[in-house]
Amino acid sequence: MSDVVKLETAPRDPRFPSTNQTMTCWVRYLEWKRCQSKDGEDSDECKKLRRWAYAMCPIDWVERWEEQQQDGTFPGPKFE
Amino acid sequence: MKFFFFSFINYKVLNDAARPWQIGFQDPATPIMEGIVNLHHDIIFFLIIIIIFVSWILFRTLFLFNSKTNPVAYNFSHGTFIELLWTLTPSLVLIGIAVPSFALLYSIDEIIDPAITIKAVGRQWYWSYEYSDYVNEENEFLAFHSYILPEEDLELGQFRLLEVDNRIIIPVNTHIRIIVTGADVIHSWAVPSLGVKCDAIPGRLNQISFFIKREGIYYGQCSEICGVNHGFMPIVIEAVSFDDYIRWVQNKILD
Ligand SMILES: [Cu+2]
C-alpha cells in the first residue's frame, strides 16, 4: 500500500537557480523526449524523466506539446 | 470537563487567517515568515527611536530659534562637523538595515531539494492544484480544483470569503516546492502565515518553497487584481502530520 505513495519529486536543478522555472519545465520535457527516442518508452531512465517533466510542467502544457508532436507542429527539436 | 483557574494560560490560539481591522502580522508557521516578522520588528524598533530623535530636534529648532527669541540672525552657513555627522549616521543606519535584510532575502530564494512538488494554477476565478508526483491505476495525476465556499454553505466557525471546497493538504516538517502559474490572466498566490506571495503569470512558471513547522489551517487570497471575482478565489492550506498526508494521498488516488 505505502509503496504506491513515494515521496520523490524532480530535484533542484543547479542550471536553473532562479524563481523563474519556465526553462526547467521545457528542458525536462525535452530530456524526456530525447530519452524516449534513444532508449524507448519503457526504460527506467525515461520513466524517471517523465515523472520529473510532469513534476515541473503544468499538465495542460505537456498535453498540448504531446498533441503538437502528433500533429507535427511541435515547435521544439525533434529526436529521431 | 474540569475547569482550572488560570488554565487559560495553557491556551495559545495562533492566528492563521485575517481578522477584522487587523494591522499586524498573522502568526508565522515557517522559518521564513519568522524571519520576516523579526526583521520588521527590529527595523521598527530603530525607526521609532529615529522618529523621536528627529521630532525632538525639529521641535527644539522651531520653538527655541524663531525670530522672536533670536532677532539677529546668525551669518554662518556651514558646519563641516555637523554635516559629516548627519550624512554618515543615516548611511550607517541604512547599511545596518541592509545586512539582515539581504540575508533574509537570499534565504527566501534558497531552494532545498524538495520532497513534494505542487503546482498551483490560477484561473478566473479559482485555483487548480496538481500533485503530479502521484498517479492512480489509470495513470491519471492527482489534481483538483479549489472553489470558494458560498456564504450560505458555511458552517459555524468557518470564515466568510476564505473557505474553499478542496483544501491543499501538505505534511509538516517537509520541504515543499510550489510551481505557480496562471491559465488566463495574472493572479497571485499568497499565504501570509507561510510568508509566501508569488505572481501566477500565464506562460511562465514561478517557483516558491516553504517548510511548515506546525499543523494548522492557513488562509490566503489571490493578491493580483484579476477580474470581477478576484476577491472570491481564496487559498486554504491544511498542514497535517506526515502519516495523515500519506493516507490522504492514498485515498485521493484510489477514488
Ligand atoms: Cu486571481
From Swiss-Prot, chain B:
Mitochondrial intermembrane side: 1-42, 105-255
EC number: 7.1.1.9
Topology Mitochondrial matrix: residue spans: 64-83
Residues reported in the UniProt entry to bind Cu cation A2: C222, E224, C226, H230
Main location: mitochondrion
CDD domains the UniProt entry points to: CcO_II_C (cd13912)
GO biological process: ATP synthesis coupled electron transport
Binding site for Mg(2+): E224
NCBIfam families: CoxB (TIGR02866)
Transmembrane segments: 43-63, 84-104
Chain residues that bind Cu cation A1: H187, C222, C226, M233
UniProt family annotation: Belongs to the cytochrome c oxidase subunit 2 family.
Subcellular location(s) of the protein: Mitochondrion inner membrane
GO cellular component: mitochondrial inner membrane
Job description of the protein: Component of the cytochrome c oxidase, the last enzyme in the mitochondrial electron transport chain which drives oxidative phosphorylation. The respiratory chain contains 3 multisubunit complexes succinate dehydrogenase (complex II, CII), ubiquinol-cytochrome c oxidoreductase (cytochrome b-c1 complex, complex III, CIII) and cytochrome c oxidase (complex IV, CIV), that cooperate to transfer electrons derived from NADH and succinate to molecular oxygen, creating an electrochemical gradient over the inner membrane that drives transmembrane transport and the ATP synthase.
Cofactor(s) required, per the database record: Cu cation
Membrane topology: Multi-pass membrane protein
Cofactor binding note from Swiss-Prot or TrEMBL: Binds a dinuclear copper A center per subunit.
Reaction(s) catalysed by this chain's protein: 4 Fe(II)-[cytochrome c] + O2 + 8 H(+)(in) = 4 Fe(III)-[cytochrome c] + 2 H2O + 4 H(+)(out)
Protein name: Cytochrome c oxidase subunit 2
A molecular function GO annotation: cytochrome-c oxidase activity
Disulphide bond pairs: none
